[in-house]
Structure formats: structure tokens, C-alpha cells
């Protein structure tokens, strides 16, 4: 039923390949004239500045289409108030490609408290206000005004995660699919190189875009159900008919899947195939109109959507919007290693477009010496949308391709000092890891390969990553290779050799990891491992740091106000932080970004990880009110005097007044401490001079075990890694990694290179 899969580098090139490769894709008529072009075949519109680097989505898309023989122009950060800028390159021969940029525009522009940000890391000089709210919609409208008959193709992280009816945090309601609101012709979701190349070539051959309804990784707006498909109705919460295949609960791991059986023959793992061919079957989701007023039904719809993300066994989705049908095709087939090498081996200039002059683009400065080695994540964290965008199957580059890029950085990046800032991706240590059983992988519906335990079919051998690190250190001109992507420590402890290699050679003083919480309730809903796993990793980290003769520290990150977190849970986390002498300045308040499971929990106050019924469901406590969200954030920053009044009030309400005072076990001081100066508070023993933010602090005066170091004032050596990094676009649709729903409330929008996650800790796409 679906069109055949063709390797993206084997298509016959379009006739315009004779124009060759442009130093930079043109952004003006003058640049087009210099290249000898009379028109553009494709015009890309993006909310980011144009940086010709594979960490920026439009650079990947532009160079990929150029390699297919098309003439591609870029309109970067246009004035959106009228159509003038959208006509600056003339009428495209084939289509407009529209994206908000590497981040969802709403997350880029607003904090998790819905406050306007005043900076933008993807804009020259970090200037805010250069893109509109809901940029995908606005840009599409202006393209339609400019040239009414030109097809509009949507892509990027904003479009990808809003492809179906979705809860929108900023308007606090369920919105329609962005495809219908934008009145575009087709939407590409996920890593869309394969779909984009097919759309471009079929348009070039004269096919109408309205006929392209069967391309994987696309969503289209139809008048009626397409013919030739069996539609399974899942639009209501009820017991399905007998003929409807219901897969086993993928969120519950059977014993034989989690641990190897002593008698494999006695308890074999069998793959139960669907009774319906995935290629000719679709699942009907509840209509947009029903989801608007039924939160429980929304949780059900979210659950169904997440069950259909496997590119091999997942089925198409159909959803009614008024009198129209939204048709979402199956997920795209992951790129092969050869295709990944092709995409990342395109002739990127690796610098911003010359029109920006000497203006600094923070996102570029953060990733100009980093390398994306893979895509995808099988961690399945509920606050993260990586599975819904990039997929669970890891797409790897070859070691040769990665080493070649290191040499390009050495030769092309101005001011290169010999330090590579990162070799990573959504996570640092999933390179060439995956399921050892192809048949199981093709049929698996589990959202995570590592929760609640590591699947025994998962290959956890880090040999390829270790070999890559060692080879990278041998590249001529490379003096130091750092790892800035978040380490998935539950995987790392399965390979002590990897931890030793990492700690000995690739940590610059601090290593970022994300336990996210300490309490079982929130951790289970986050689908994160318990603190016992963290403790095991910390022991290994400390051991190998000592063996290497280095003083190195872990930087643990935590989320406040995540669905399922009670005031008591946050208090216990605060007490754990105090006991372990951590003081967090970059606090991550939960940010409900589109499509992730945690956002469904936030909106529905129900757990979509389990079967959802009206009378039988698991209710989830959610911190929605501003005051409770402020309290949860304040408890993470228990050391800040500005938060003490709110914490005191909460402790009294909770019957925990004994935690107020100056005794070692107290969380905050009594009220008379508020009147003291910072120097007086330090002298009183509440805060030692050796405190430093969001880092592992040495023992502080006033806390147990402080005698050896009290007042030492010593700090560990700082590493060379920034806590901020932009999204590196592994996605052909405009963003490397999807947003994680945990976001920094400090107002920064600098873009996280390590993960969808939008706004999170100043990092729009961190993955865990």
C-alpha cells in the first residue's frame, strides 16, 4: 500500500544539478543572480538564523535537496507582519518548506510560567522577538498570501509534535492538528529526509501534491477515509470487539523479557503478530471535537498514538476534524548507516551565513565543535517526545564518517583550539546499541527498552562507543574530546569499561546526568530508574576519577512539578539535596510540551501508561496552580532566602514545622534569619563560602560531616563545558531533538544540544 522505500542517495538527480554546489544557499535575489539562477525550485522558510551546519535543520534540508539537484533558497527569520519577505526569492517552482526552527516557537518564546523570554539563542546577538508565536502557522499563512497556488510542506519539531489534535499548554485547551490550522498541503514528521526527497521528486515529475497520500512519515488532510484500508475504531473507551487485536500492555515488562530465564526452552519469548497487516490497517482516534471536552478520552487517545510509533508494526492513524479526515501515515523507516553518512557528509560550510557579519549566534557558538553521532532514543522518558519525533530505533553514523567530520571541524571552524565539545546525540551512550532480535524489534510496542528494567534483548555492549572515543582522540589536531550529552547511567553501569573510559578521558570536571527525582511515585511516571541505580553509577564515577587522579563531580538534574509529584515528594527531594550538599540554581519546572506522555498526564490527570477507562483508571496528582508550581520549584532551591517564606508556610501546613530552624536536620531557618545579611548568614553556618551553583558542593559548615572542610572555601576545578547547548538537528524537519517537557524557568531559550528538550535547563532538547 505504501510506496516502496528507496535509499535517499540513489534517486535520479533533478536537471538543475548542473548549477553545482553553492557556497551558501542563497538568501536574496542578489545571491541567486551570482549563482546564475533565474528562480528557486524550493524555498525554505525558518524561524532560525541560517547557519550552514548539520546541527541546524534547514541546513540539512537545504543541502540534502541541493544534492538531489534542486535549486534551494532560504528565507531565515522573515518579517511576518506582511508577505513582502516571503516574496524576496520569487515564486518557487515546486514548493515552500516551512518550519518554526530547531525549537517549538512557543517554548522558544515563553518560560514554563508562560512569561515572555527576551532572548533567543538561534538569533544573531541573542536577540528575542525575531519569530512569531506559532511560527509554523504564521509563516504558512504568509506563504499562501504571497503565492496562492504554490504547495506548502510543513516540517520541523513544532509541526511534527502537533500533527494530531493536541493539548496546548499556552492556551490551556486542545487544539486541532497544525496541518489543518495552517491550511498547508502536507506535513512531514520525524526524521523526514526520506519523505522530503520523495515529495520533491514526485512534484518535479508533475504529480499533484494532493495525490501524495501514501508516503510514510507524512500527514495529509482528506475529505474521506482512503480506500483499501481496514479501519479499527478506537475512538471510544470500551472493550474492543473480539476481532480487534489488542497487544499486551507494552508498559508492563514480563519476567522473561526482563531477565534471562534459566530454562530458555521452558519459557520462550514469542512474538504475537497482529491479525491485521500494518500496511493496510489504520486506527481511528477520537475526533478533535470529542477530545476538546473529554480529558479521560484524551488520555486514551494519547495512549493509542504512542502504541503506534514502531515504524515496522505501527499502523496509520485517522482522526476526524469537523468534516475532514486527518490521515497520519506510518512512521518513517529509520535511515541506514550509509544514508546517515550521506546526510552528514554533505558540503556544509559549518559557519553562519556571511550576511550576519560579526554578530554572535549563541546556538552556533555552543555546537560549532560538537558532532552528532546518532539519532533516536529508546529510553522512553514520559516527559520527552524523542520517540514520537526521532523514533526508538537508534540511527548510527559510521566511525569513518564521524572522524571525517572531526577533521572538517579542525580545518573549517575559525579559531578551533583542538577541543571537541561533544560526541553525542539525544544521549551520550546509545551509539550502536539496540535490539539483538530483529523480529522482536519489528513487533515491539514497549515505549522503553530500559524501564522498568533493561530488556534482555537489548545489546548494552559499549565497545563501539569506546572504540570511537579512542579513535577520536587520535585525530591529528584534536587535543581533547569532551562528552557534553547526558549520560544514560542505567546503561553505563552495564559497561564498567565505558564508565572508566569516559571518566578518565572525557570529563572536564563535571558530568551531567539526570536522575530527575528521588521518589518512586514520580520516577515510575517519568519512566526513570530509581536512586539505587544513580548510587551505583556515582560509586563507579568516584572510583575511576580517583584512579585517574582527578577531582570530578556529577551534576544531577531534577524536575519539579512533574505530574505525579506531591508536595511530600518534593520535600523529600529537597531533604535529599540538603543531605548530599547540592544547591541547584538552574531549576527545571515541568513544561508540558506537545505530544509527550507527561503532558497527557498533566492535562487529563490520568495515567495513560496504563489502560484508561472512565471508572477504572489511575488518577495522577498534578501541580497546576501557580502557587503549587512555585512551591515545588522553591523546594528545589531550598537554599535561596527568597524561597524561605513560601517553604515555611508549606512546612507548617504539612505538619513539618520541625524542619524549620538552625538544627542540622532542618531545611530552612527560622524567620529571624531573613533579616540577616548574606555575610551574617554565612557566619551563622547556614551557607558556607564554598557553595557553588548546580554543582557538587564540598561539605558545607553547619551540616553533618563538615569538620574536615568547614570554611575551606575550595571549589572543584571547573570543566570546559557549558550548561547550555543548542539542539543539533538530526531531524530533516528542522530540529535535532524533540522537546523534553522539563524546562528551565529562568527565562533562557538557549537551546539544548543534547535533546528535544525544549527550554529545559536552557537546553531545548535534552534527552535522558
Curated annotation (Swiss-Prot):
The keyword 4Fe-4S applies. One of its GO terms (molecular function) is 4 iron, 4 sulfur cluster binding. Residues 679-689 have a biased composition (Basic residues). InterPro entries: Elp3/MiaA/NifB-like_rSAM (IPR006638), Methylthiotransferase_CS (IPR020612), rSAM (IPR007197), rSAM_horseshoe (IPR023404), UPF0313 (IPR022946), UPF0313_C (IPR024560), UPF0313_N (IPR013704). [4Fe-4S] cluster binds at residues 377, 381, 384. The keyword Kinase does not apply. Residues 363-640 form the Radical SAM core domain. Binds 1 [4Fe-4S] cluster. The cluster is coordinated with 3 cysteines and an exchangeable S-adenosyl-L-methionine. Keywords: 4Fe-4S, Iron, Iron-sulfur, Metal-binding, S-adenosyl-L-methionine. Residues 719-731 have a biased composition (Polar residues). Residues 674-768 are annotated as: Disordered. It holds the Pfam family Radical_SAM_N. PROSITE patterns: RADICAL_SAM. Belongs to the UPF0313 family. NCBIfam families: SAM_YgiQ. This is UPF0313 protein VV1_2212.
Amino acid at each position: 500500500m505504501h510506496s516502496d522505500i528507496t535509499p535517499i542517495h540513489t534517486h535520479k538527480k533533478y536537471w538543475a544539478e548542473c548549477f553545482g554546489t553553492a557556497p551558501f544557499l542563497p538568501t536574496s535575489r542578489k545571491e541567486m543572480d551570482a549563482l546564475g539562477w533565474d528562480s528557486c525550485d524550493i524555498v525554505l522558510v525558518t524561524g532560525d538564523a541560517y547557519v550552514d551546519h548539520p546541527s541546524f535543520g534547514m541546513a540539512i534540508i537545504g543541502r540534502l535537496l541541493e544534492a538531489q539537484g534542486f535549486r534551494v533558497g532560504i528565507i531565515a527569520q522573515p518579517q511576518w507582519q506582511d508577505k513582502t519577505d516571503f516574496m524576496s526569492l520569487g515564486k518557487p517552482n515546486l514548493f515552500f518548506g516551512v518550519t518554526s526552527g530547531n525549537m517549538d516557537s512557543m517554548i522558544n518564546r515563553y518560560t514554563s510560567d508562560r512569561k515572555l523570554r527576551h532572548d533567543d539563542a538561534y538569533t544573531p546577538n541573542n536577540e528575542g522577538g525575531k519569530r512569531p508565536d506559532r511560527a509554523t502557522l504564521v509563516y504558512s499563512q504568509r506563504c499562501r498570501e504571497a503565492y496562492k497556488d504554490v504547495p506548502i510542506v510543513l516540517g520541523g519539531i513544532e509541526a511534527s509534535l502537533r500533527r494530531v489534535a493536541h493539548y496546548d499548554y499556552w492556551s490551556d485547551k486542545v487544539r486541532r492538528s497544525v496541518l489543518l490550522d495552517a491550511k498547508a498541503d502536507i506535513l512531514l514528521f520525524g526524521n523526514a529526509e526520506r519523505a522530503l526527497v520523495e515529495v520533491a521528486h514526485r512534484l518535479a515529475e508533475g504529480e499533484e501534491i494532493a495525490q501524495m497520500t501514501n508516503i510514510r512519515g507524512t500527514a495529509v488532510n482528506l475529505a474521506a477515509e482512503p480506500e483499501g484500508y481496514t479501519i479499527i475504531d478506537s475512538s471510544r473507551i470500551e472493550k474492543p470487539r473480539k476481532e480487534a487485536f489488542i497487544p499486551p500492555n507494552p508498559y508492563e515488562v514480563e519476567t522473561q523479557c526482563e531477565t534471562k530465564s534459566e530454562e530458555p526452552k521452558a519459557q520462550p519469548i514469542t512474538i504475537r503478530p497482529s491479525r491485521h497487516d500494518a500496511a493496510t490497517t489504520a486506527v481511528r482516534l477520537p475526533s478533535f471535537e470529542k477530545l476538546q471536552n473529554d480529558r479521560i478520552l484524551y488520555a486514551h487517545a494519547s495512549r493509542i498514538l504512542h502504541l503506534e510509533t514502531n515504524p515496522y508494526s505501527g499502523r496509520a492513524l485517522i482522526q476526524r476534524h469537523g468534516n475532514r479526515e486527518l490521515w497520519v501515515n506510518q512512521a518513517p523507516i529509520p535511515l541506514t548507516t550509509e544514508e546517515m553518512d550521506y546526510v552528514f557528509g554533505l558540503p556544509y560550510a559549518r559557519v553562519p551565513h556571511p550576511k550576519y557579519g560579526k554578530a554572535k549566534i549563541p546556538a552556533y557558538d555552543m555546537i560549532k565543535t560538537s558532532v552528532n553521532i546518532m539519532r533516536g532514543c529508546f529510553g522512553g522518558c514520559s516527559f520527552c517526545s524523542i520517540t514520537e519525533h526521532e523514533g526508538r530505533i537508534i540511527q548510527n553514523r559510521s566511525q569513518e564518517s564521524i572522524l571525517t567530520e572531526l577533521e572538517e571541524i579542525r580545518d573549517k571552524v575559525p579559531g578551533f583550539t583542538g577541543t571537541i565539545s561533544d560526541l553525542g546525540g539525544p544521549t551520550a551512550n546509545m551509539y550502536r546499541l539496540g535490539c539483538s532480535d530483529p523480529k522482536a524489534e519489528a513487533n515491539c510496542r514497549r515505549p522503553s527498552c530500559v524501564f522498568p528494567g533493561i530488556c534482555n534483548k537489548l545489546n548494552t555492549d559499549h565497545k563501539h562507543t569506546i572504540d570511537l572515543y579512542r579513535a577520536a582522540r587520535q585525530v591529528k589536531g584534536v587535543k581533547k574530546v569532551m562528552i557534553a550529552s547526558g549520560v544514560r547511567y542505567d546503561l553505563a553501569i552495564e559497561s564498567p569499561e565505558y564508565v572508566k573510559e569516559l571518566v578518565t578521558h572525557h570529563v572536564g570536571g563535571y558530568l551531567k546526568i539526570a536522575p530527575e527525582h528521588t521518589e518512586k511515585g514520580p520516577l515510575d511516571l517519568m519512566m526513570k530508574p530509581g536512586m539505587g541505580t544513580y548510587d551505583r553509577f556515582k560509586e563507579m564515577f568516584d572510583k575511576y576519577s580517583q584512579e585517574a587522579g582527578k577531582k570530578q563531580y556529577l551534576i544531577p538534574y531534577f524536575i519539579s512539578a512533574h505530574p505525579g509529584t506531591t508536595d511530600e515528594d518534593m520535600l523529600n527531594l529537597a531533604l535529599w539535596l540538603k543531605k548530599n550538599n547540592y544547591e541547584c540554581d538552574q531549576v527545571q519546572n515541568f513544561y508540558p510540551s506537545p505530544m509527550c506522555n507527561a503532558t497527557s498526564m498533566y492535562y487529563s490527570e490520568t495515567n495513560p501508561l496504563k489502560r484508561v477507562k472512565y471508572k477504572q483508571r489511575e488518577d495522577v496528582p498534578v501541580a497546576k496552580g501557580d502557587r503549587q508550581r512555585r512551591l515545588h520549584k522553591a523546594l528545589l532551591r531550598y537554599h535561596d532566602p527568597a524561597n524561605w517564606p513560601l517553604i515555611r508556610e508549606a512546612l507548617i501546613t504539612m505538619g513539618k514545622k520541625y524542619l524549620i530552624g538552625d538544627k542540622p536536620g532542618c531545611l530552612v531557618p527560622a524567620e529571624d534569619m531573613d533579616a540577616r545579611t548574606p555575610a551574617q548568614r554565612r557566619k551563622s553556618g547556614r551557607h558556607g563560602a564554598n557553595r557553588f551553583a548546580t554543582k557538587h558542593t564540598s561539605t558545607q559548615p553547619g551540616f553533618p560531616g563538615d569538620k574536615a572542610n568547614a570554611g575551606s572555601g575550595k571549589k572543584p576545578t571547573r570543566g570546559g563545558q557549558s550548561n547550555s547547548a543548542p539542539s543539533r538537528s538530526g531531524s530533516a524537519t528542522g530540529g535535532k531533538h524533540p522537546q523534553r517537557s522539563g524546562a528551565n524557568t529562568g527565562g533562557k531559550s538557549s537551546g539544548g544540544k543534547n535533546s528535544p528538550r525544549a527550554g529545559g535547563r536552557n537546553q531545548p532538547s535534552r534527552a535522558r
